[in-house]
Design a protein with these regions (language model features):
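Conserved PLP-enzyme active-site core in the AAT-like
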Residues: 2-6, 15-17, 21-24, 84-315
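N-terminal glycine-rich, Lys/His-bearing helix-loop that initiates the first secondary-structure elements
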Residues: 1-55
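Conserved N-terminal alpha-helix of the aminotransferase class I/II PLP-enzyme fold
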Residues: 38, 43-95, 117-124
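Glycine-centered tight turns that cap/initiate beta-strands
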Residues: 80, 151, 317-320, 367, ...
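Conserved small-domain helix->loop->beta segment predominantly found in fold-type I
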Residues: 275-278, 282-284, 289, 293, ...
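PLP-dependent enzyme catalytic core of the Aspartate aminotransferase-like
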Residues: 1-2, 123, 132-134, 150, ...
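Glycine-rich beta-alpha junction loops
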Residues: 20-22, 35-41, 212, 229-230, ...
Length: 429
């Protein structure tokens, strides 16, 4: 059970009510869209207290907005964290999260089995500003241990990997990270808080591309990070940024003065202030609309994905299916531990005949859409090596488990029988 207003409620209740209440002036039930850039101050002293971080409140919509705040409160409640911060996209949240932990000369250890754009951001863009990322096999715990040194600032993994749906052993990775005084960062985009709450397994920070399953309708871009409030920066020699006075706030020491909220406070007041990747109020409103049906959608999507994966697994023209919910999957036991409600809606498969056969399959589909997004109400398909992971080298593709014939399927809300029929006719084409 989860808690709100001093009472314990279930997940489905929180996904509808957490973070909002009827407007006190108009008594409107729905969340208002506060389409504003700025806010009035009660006095000069009031403004000064806000700017000095001595009092909470709205200053400027680059840093906070009431509509966005409601979204942040809801996600924090669903994830089980002490606070959350929404930004313009999942990529923006990821980039800012790592800049909030690391700087030039520092290192991050990351799974290699992640979204191709994330590999490029970590391995190229962060490298250009002096942050080195060591990519390792997510299932090789010894490799994670061996990659740690005195400059390591974070472990990063996707709860369910993109695109091959490998399931991370979050608990074991968090144990290694914490033994070295390092925070565990988990991307929960493919699971959402309904299927998995990484904080319960030791994650310190949880990242979502809310653009995907949280929003659920392909209408709004947004990213969110939740702070578990569990990582103690105070006195940790790896994090001088949290233990030394910050000159831009007249000597604030985030670990000391902000306590458990040091990370999320610094992320808002420095990263969002300086880099400006704020979430638009309308986008926050649209994501909130999607969250109200989250559990219903994720249950349906997971059930349909399992049905489709089983059908493809038995098809004579299908060479492989990577879906962790299948009893034959190497990750099936982890699904029982980490994903008991369902294994999500994204997986990969390939046909005998290589890339040409996979391309013909995609081009022959009539109902399923050829799109690079995932987490939509509609079922989507793509060829990772040509799209989401096209920036990777052949070696990186191999390390990520992406073959030339691999296609990625993101299952939507349609009748699974209709989706299976469309796949069958395209395979036969």
């Amino acid at each position: 059970m989860l808690e709100i207003k001093g009472k314990n409620y279930g997940f489905d209740t929180l996904m509808v009510h957490a973070g909002t209440q009827p407007d006190p002036d108009t008594h409107a039930v729905a969340l208002p869209i506060y389409q504003t850039t700025a806010y009035t101050f009660d006095s000069v002293d009031h403004a000064a207290r806000l700017f000095e971080l001595k009092e909470a409140g709205n200053i400027y919509s680059r840093m906070s907005d009431p509509t966005v705040d409601a979204l942040e409160r809801r996600i924090a409640a669903l994830d089980g964290g002490i606070g959350a911060l929404a930004m313009s996209s999942g990529h923006a949240v990821m980039f800012n999260t790592f800049l909030n932990l690391a700087g030039a000369g520092d290192e991050i250890v990351s799974s290699i089995c992640i979204y191709g754009g994330a590999i490029n951001m970590l391995g190229v863009t962060l490298d250009r500003i002096g942050i080195k990322v060591r990519f390792v096999d997510p299932d090789d715990l010894d490799a994670w241990e061996a990659a740690v040194n005195d400059r390591t600032k974070a472990f990063f993994v996707e709860g369910i990997g993109n695109p091959n749906a490998n399931v991370a052993d979050i608990g074991s990775l968090a144990d290694i990270a914490h033994r070295h005084g390092i925070p565990m960062v988990v991307d929960s985009t493919f699971t959402t808080p309904y299927l998995q709450r990484p904080i319960e397994y030791g994650a310190d920070f949880v990242i979502h591309s809310a653009t995907k399953f949280l929003g659920g309708h392909g209408t709004a871009m947004c990213g969110i990070v939740t702070d578990a409030g569990t990582f103690d920066f105070s006195g940790n020699p790896r994090f001088p940024l949290y233990n030394e006075p910050d000159v831009s706030y007249h000597g604030v020491v985030f670990a000391k003065d902000c306590g458990k909220a040091g990370f999320i406070t610094r992320l808002r007041t420095m990263m969002l202030r300086d880099l400006g990747a704020c979430c638009a109020p309308l986008n926050a409103f649209l994501i909130m609309q999607g969250i109200e049906t989250l559990s219903l959608r994720m249950r349906r999507i997971s059930d349909s994905a399992l049905e489709i994966a089983r059908h493809l697994k038995a098809h004579p023209d299908v060479a492989f299916v990577n879906y962790p919910g299948l009893e034959s999957s190497r990750y099936y036991d982890r699904v029982q531990r980490y994903l008991p409600k369902g294994a999500g809606g994204v997986f990969t498969f390939g046909l005998h005949g290589g890339r040409e056969r996979g391309a013909r399959l995609i081009d022959s589909l009539e109902l399923i859409m050829h799109v690079t997004n995932v987490g939509d109400a509609r079922t989507l398909i793509s060829h990772p090596a040509s799209t989401t992971h096209s920036q990777l080298s052949d070696e990186q593709l191999a390390e990520s488990g992406i073959r030339p014939e691999t296609v990625r399927l993101s299952v939507g809300l349609e009748d699974p029988a209709a989706l299976i029929a469309d796949l069958d006719q395209a395979i036969a084409a």
